Design a protein with these regions (language model features):
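Alpha-helical transmembrane segments and immediately membrane-proximal extracytoplasmic
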Residues: 1-443, 447, 451-464, 477-480, ...
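Tandem CBS (Bateman) regulatory domains
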Residues: 422-455, 462-471, 489-544, 551, ...
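Cytosolic Rossmann-like ligand/nucleotide-binding regulatory domains
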Residues: 476-477, 545
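Short, acidic, Ser/Thr-enriched surface-loop or helix-capping motifs
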Residues: 483-485, 549-552
Length: 585
């Protein structure tokens, strides 16, 4: 919406027909997201077979079935070494799990990502995960899909906001293709990536995720990844869900804190960061030697945990080893994702807790605990709940999922200043505020905050009289509106408007020739416009004050709005947020 445009008809949304064009581009991006997911998953399978079974194959095989013995310790080290070299001499953007990097590009990089990232991120992630790295494909596909969306957007004349929409469309389309969870992917965009809730961004993301969801069965398996059907729940499950949520949130906070402590320890090493992933690989290799199921993506392990195929002791061992090697590996700055490891860790917690939690069958608690851990780490409870449902299609679990993720989210919100998603960005000097609300400037109109008493200069005064009366020692304002005898606005003048060579005997009206009037016609505010529109117009044209007129035809001056007036809506907002009062007695 142009800052100079005047809108006479109020609407719920500011979307226009450009939304259709962006949505059409999102269709292409959705298809590309599916292709990118297919390529990434096959890269992971290829490198898994190459590292652990010394074969060139795209077959789905788990690292846990290897027979390498102690040699398995060297594989994550080798993978980390290769990725360190790729990051050093290719692109440093491939380091990390992808989501913070995508957020940084969205908020502070005008949503511009390079082709290098689109190529090197899936390659590096395939190598790391294929060599035993305890990561999932979702972080890399979010970064890769986002890079593809950004690159396609850069082919067109788009605003940074439109590029952001297409970047997020690519990221969420990739996530949809990997997991088959389009609704959860849209919610991830809303809760974590878009930083707004508007049709201009929501609709293209929905389109891209829908296209990815429809095209997914053409290249990947159809249906839920982990089909599950739990039994009905009793009232006692209410208290069990609260406890599971608290413990899931506590585990989330513990892992988040541990991750950045490990990252700080790596930062103190007298070695270039290029070597850190190889050092982290040592811990991964040792952990994988004692607990092979902790290596790699581990989708098969998630299925075993959800279906109760692991005993409590095995689940506890897996939980501890997976958490430790994940924290160390990710803290070393290697390339990987967070969702799949969190699912394993959370499901392991649920398996351990299941014998002591009444109200639901044993399969319910691994599911709700994995969603709780995910909600706590991401700070996205709706995404976590719907994601867990999308993975299993278990309708009986929806209510427990909602409560457990909400409790875990509340726990981490109250106990953690930052999440894994934002801490890295904050350490680079950026502040991210994740609470959204209606802009106070959007809720009040110009006529509610403007000054109704206006000092205006009659156009019939001479230039000399104007300078003497309004721009002499008694000057009050930097600029003044100039009006004709019917109080119709001609324009605004300030001292710099008068040329030193100007004839002081000329009437002030001579300054306002037809060309000037046409150029400045839009530089007014209407009383029915919101303060946000007025603020945008003032910021765009570097103005301190805007004259307020009844309408654009008569241009009759009725007030003036200044920058200081735009503070008034914030006072009302402050009263609503801070002023406590009892209304019923």
């Amino acid at each position: 919406m142009a800052a100079t445009a005047h809108h006479h008809h109020k609407r719920d949304f500011a979307a226009d027909t450009r939304l259709l064009r962006i949505s059409l581009i999102a269709v292409v991006i959705g298809g590309c997201g599916t292709l990118a997911a297919y390529a990434l998953l096959n890269l992971i399978r290829l490198f898994t077979n190459l590292f652990f079974y010394q074969s060139l194959s795209f077959a789905v095989r788990s690292p846990a079935g290897n027979h390498l013995g102690l040699w398995v310790i060297l594989l994550p080290v080798l993978g980390g070494l290769v990725v360190g070299l790729i990051a050093r001499f290719g692109s440093e953007k491939i380091r990390g799990h992808g989501i913070p990097e995508a957020i940084e590009a969205i908020l502070f990089g005008k949503s511009k990502m390079s082709a290098k990232v689109a190529v090197l991120k899936p390659l590096s992630s395939g190598i790391v995960i294929g060599s035993g790295g305890p990561f999932g494909a979702e972080g890399p596909i979010i970064m890769t899909g986002g890079a593809i969306g950004s690159l396609i957007a850069q082919l067109f004349h788009l605003t940074a906001a439109e590029r952001k929409t297409l970047l997020v469309a690519g990221a969420t389309a990739g996530m949809t293709a990997v997991f088959g969870t389009p609704v959860a992917a849209v919610l991830l965009a809303v809760e974590l990536l878009l930083f707004e809730l508007r049709p201009r961004s929501l609709l293209p993301v929905i389109v891209a995720c829908a296209v990815a969801g429809f095209t997914r069965p053409l290249l990947l398996e159809a249906g839920p990844l982990f089909p599950l059907q739990t039994g009905t729940i009793g009232l006692s499950a209410l208290f069990s869900c609260v406890l599971a949520g608290i413990l899931g949130g506590a585990l989330s906070a513990l892992m988040s804190s541990a991750l950045y402590r490990v990252e700080d320890l790596f930062g103190k090493l007298p070695l270039h960061w290029m070597w850190w992933p190889a050092l982290g690989g040592i811990a991964v290799g040792i952990g994988g030697y004692f607990e092979p199921r902790a290596l790699g993506v581990g989708y098969d392990v998630i299925g075993d945990l959800l279906n109760g195929n692991l005993l409590m002791q095995a689940a506890l061992s897996l939980l501890l080893v997976k958490a430790v090697i994940w924290v160390i590996a990710l803290g070393s700055g290697t390339s990987g994702g967070v969702l799949a490891p969190l699912l394993i860790i959370g499901a392991g917690l649920g398996t351990v807790l299941a014998p002591w939690l009444p109200g639901g069958d044993a399969h319910l608690w691994p599911l709700v605990c994995m969603a709780a851990v995910l909600a706590g780490v991401l700070g996205a409870p709706l995404t976590a709940a719907v994601f867990a449902f999308g993975l299993t299609h278990d309708t009986n679990a929806l209510l427990p999922l909602l409560l457990t993720t909400g409790v875990a989210y509340g726990f981490t919100v109250l106990t953690m200043r930052r999440s894994i998603m934002t801490e890295k960005i904050a350490r680079r000097g950026y502040h991210i505020y994740r609470e959204y609300g209606v802009d106070p400037l959007e809720r009040q109109h110009v006529d509610e905050v403007m000054s109704h008493t206006v000092t205006a200069i009659p156009a019939y005064l001479t230039i000399a009289e104007t300078l003497a009366q309004y721009f002499g020692p008694q000057q009050v304002h930097r600029c003044y509106p100039v009006v004709d005898i019917e109080y119709g606005l001609l324009g605004m003048v300030e001292r710099s408007s008068f040329s030193p060579q100007a004839d002081g005997s000329n009437a002030l009206a001579t300054l306002f020739n037809p060309a000037y009037l046409e150029q400045s016609a839009a530089l007014v505010a209407l009383p029915s416009e919101t303060c946000r529109i007025a603020a945008a117009r003032m910021a765009t044209h570097h103005l301190e004050r805007l004259p307020v007129v009844t309408d654009l035809h008569s241009r009759r001056l009725i007030g003036i709005i200044s920058r200081s007036d735009l503070i008034k809506p914030s006072r009302l907002f402050f009263d609503e947020e801070q002023k406590r009062e009892r209304l019923l007695r």
